[in-house]
Curated annotation (Swiss-Prot):
Species annotation: Clostridium perfringens (strain 13 / Type A)
Entry function: Small subunit of the glutamine-dependent carbamoyl phosphate synthetase (CPSase). CPSase catalyzes the formation of carbamoyl phosphate from the ammonia moiety of glutamine, carbonate, and phosphate donated by ATP, constituting the first step of 2 biosynthetic pathways, one leading to arginine and/or urea and the other to pyrimidine nucleotides. The small subunit (glutamine amidotransferase) binds and cleaves glutamine to supply the large subunit with the substrate ammonia.
Listed name of the protein: Carbamoyl phosphate synthase small chain
A Gene Ontology BP annotation from the UniProt entry: L-arginine biosynthetic process
Sequence similarity: Belongs to the CarA family.
Chain residue ranges for the region called CPSase: 1-170
Source domain of life: Bacteria
Enzyme Commission identifier(s): 6.3.5.5
SUPFAM superfamilies named in the record: Carbamoyl phosphate synthetase, small subunit N-terminal domain, Class I glutamine amidotransferase-like
Glutamine amidotransferase type-1 domain residues: 170-349
Length: 349
């Protein structure tokens, strides 16, 4: 079936719909990864977004049900230049189209993803809607204006506290939309993990007497998370705190810093980051649309983006606080920076 992507600036791309055949609206972004599309589909940080893959052929190795970052896809829509018709891999369990159809995600195939990416790069991230050939186009503008991703964290976070037993350090994880491979990295280091929902209370976290508090990744604008920031403030100085992505941004706000929105975000598996402590450059996996713009004097920048110079890591000069903007757990992407989890554990009591 024919379908169209209509951007809020009026630009239209025509292609073919696949997967679940129902229109979708969201924030249109692009990811530069050559592989890792199933991790992208299931990464909670992509909630509310229509993701464009810049690599021209997607679906080559199908879908396996082991490498998912959450139980089901979190994207609103999925745009590719060409979907692979005949995936081939010994781990393949489903074709991409079948997986999207089963999980009610609309795909768009056959558009010029290079041209779309250039529009997003030059004009910035914007809202968009994928409509089917038989859709009513009269209310498209109203649907775009009505779309909001403000409550995304409440949707992707766990609903209740749960524990994964281990013999090592006790880690309290605040789930703002955590990827499963982050949890796996703590578990394989022997940690006794307790995961709290996004609307946690500091008293509940401190009650389990954790050796380390971890703030997870997640979708949306960190400035919408005022209640979480207030609770984090109650933990600062009482327990070591580390974080990734949204957790990194929330820590910055907690300590008096400022966050802003990037023009088109960092999304992909090939983002170079310089470690200022070790004077080394790592290729990292990233997925964020906001960044830490300013920091108070008691914070030290530890990592910076080699592409645009934005803050990619920070630590407190006196308190046991450390966080990074990139994703050291990869999935997808290189594991150059997986050592960050060992750095996290050095902060544990």
């Amino acid at each position: 079936m024919k379908a169209k992507l209509i951007l809020e600036n009026g630009v239209v791309f025509e292609g073919k719909a696949f997967g679940y055949l129902k229109e979708c609206v969201g924030e249109v972004v692009f990811n530069t990864g050559m592989t890792g599309y199933q991790e992208v589909l299931t990464d909670p940080s992509y909630y509310g977004q229509i993701v464009t893959m810049t690599y021209p052929l997607i679906g080559n190795y199908g879908i396996n049900l082991e490498d998912l970052e959450s139980k089901e896809p979190k994207v609103r829509g999925f745009i590719v230049r060409e979907k692979c018709q005949y995936p081939n891999n010994f781990r393949c369990e489903l074709e991409l189209e079948t997986y999207l159809a089963q999980n009610k995600v609309l795909g768009l195939d056959g558009i010029d993803t290079r041209a779309l990416t250039k529009i997003l790069r030059n004009n910035g991230t914007m809202k968009g809607i994928i409509v089917l050939d038989n859709s009513n186009l009269e209310d498209v503008k109203d649907k775009l204006e009505a779309f909001s991703n403000r409550d995304a964290v409440s949707i992707v976070s766990t609903n209740e506290k749960y524990e994964i037993s281990g013999e090592g350090k006790k880690v309290a994880i605040i789930d703002f939309g955590i990827k499963q491979n982050i949890i796996r990295n703590f578990v394989k280091r022997g940690c006794n993990v307790t995961v709290f929902p996004y609307d946690f209370k500091a008293e509940e976290v401190l009650e389990i007497n954790p050796d380390l508090v971890f703030l997870s990744n997640g979708p949306g604008d960190p400035e919408d998370m005022g209640e979480a920031v207030n609770e984090i403030k109650k933990i600062v100085g009482k327990k070591p705190i580390v974080g990734i992505c949204l957790g990194h941004q929330l820590l910055a706000l907690t300590l008096g810093g400022e966050t802003k929105k990037l023009k088109f975000g960092h999304r992909g598996c090939n983002h170079p980051v310089k470690d200022l402590i070790n004077n080394r450059v790592h290729i990292t996996s990233q997925n964020h649309g906001y960044y830490v713009a300013t920091l108070p004097e008691n914070m030290e920048i530890t990592h910076v983006s080699m592409n645009d110079g934005t803050v990619e890591g920070m630590k407190h000069k006196e308190l046991p606080i450390f966080s990074v903007q990139f994703h050291p757990e990869a999935c997808p992407g290189p594991k150059d920076s997986e050592y960050i989890f060992d750095e996290f554990m050095k902060y544990a009591l």
